[in-house]
Amino acid sequence: MGILVFDVGTSSMKGALLNDKAEILCQFHRKYHPTFYSSVKVTQDPEIWRKALYDIARDVGDWCKDQNEEVEMISLTAQRTSIIPVDHKGDPLCDAVMWQDKRNIEVCTRLSAMNGQIIRKSGTMVNPVFSGSKMAWLKETQPEIYKKADRIFVVADYLLYHMTGQRKLDRTYASRSHLMNLRTGRWDSVLLDIFGIEKNKLCDLIDPGELHGYTNEKFAASTRLKTGIPVYSAGGDQQCSALGMGIYEEGDMEVTSGTGAFIIGITEKIPICLLYTSPS
């Protein structure tokens, strides 16, 4: 069995074909970079990601043809909070607002007055890196784009849509939006009201590791892979990183350093208070 795994980072995309023993049979990558217009404005053309996805899948397909192998399953993990408003065909209406973009800082400052409710429901306090405040900023500053948007994707559901045609998002990405109730695992009506986001702009939620759909004819024609390959959402890149480093039990912690740096730990219960602390 050949399992094709995509890892969509901020500065490159990697694709690796693994066998059923998790041994790497082949791997390919494409480099790219966001555009930094200023210290607060950071964007990227979403078509760069789609092209990289197709190019890597085509490389894997060519390798499989030469080696008499076959892709039987696809899984994808990606950066988590860059947003992409798309039309009903899944085509971008503007450049992606990257996770490093801080033009939503005024929105966050205003919403921080609601931190009590937001923390209790979403598990995190308002921060410009998360996608919900980026959506609120888009609605306030570019209302025509927001109005035209059939969905507001993050990078993962944008690419998964172009493989399967399904509008779904796994909960590891939604947990970084401030719009999902961390206790119910559902979009929360109170949080949606606070941020001013309509539920129909968001994708249906699934669990990480759940079947997202199957490769469609358009993807197959663009990559020379077959139709009907099951496609799974592996979860957000940092959650997958933690699992890959053996972080399974309460008390386990790991440090990841890439374009961003993270300290990640496991807890069995959601903390009651997640406010930041300092000596002062």
Predicted regions and their residues:
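Gly/Ser/Thr-rich active-site cleft segment
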Residues: 2, 8-10, 118-235
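N-terminal glycine/serine-rich phosphate-binding loop of ATP-dependent small-molecule kinases
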Residues: 1-94, 120, 148, 203, ...
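Conserved small/polar residues in nucleotide/adenosyl-binding loops
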Residues: 276-280
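Short acidic, glycine/serine/threonine-rich loops at helix termini
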Residues: 84-88, 163-167, 215-218, 243-247, ...
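Carbohydrate-associated surface elements
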Residues: 101
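Short glycine-aspartate micro-motif
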Residues: 3-7, 71-76, 152, 230-244, ...
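Pocket-flanking alpha-helical
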Residues: 106-111, 241-243
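Short clusters of small/polar residues that mark proteolytic maturation junctions
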Residues: 29, 97, 172-173, 268
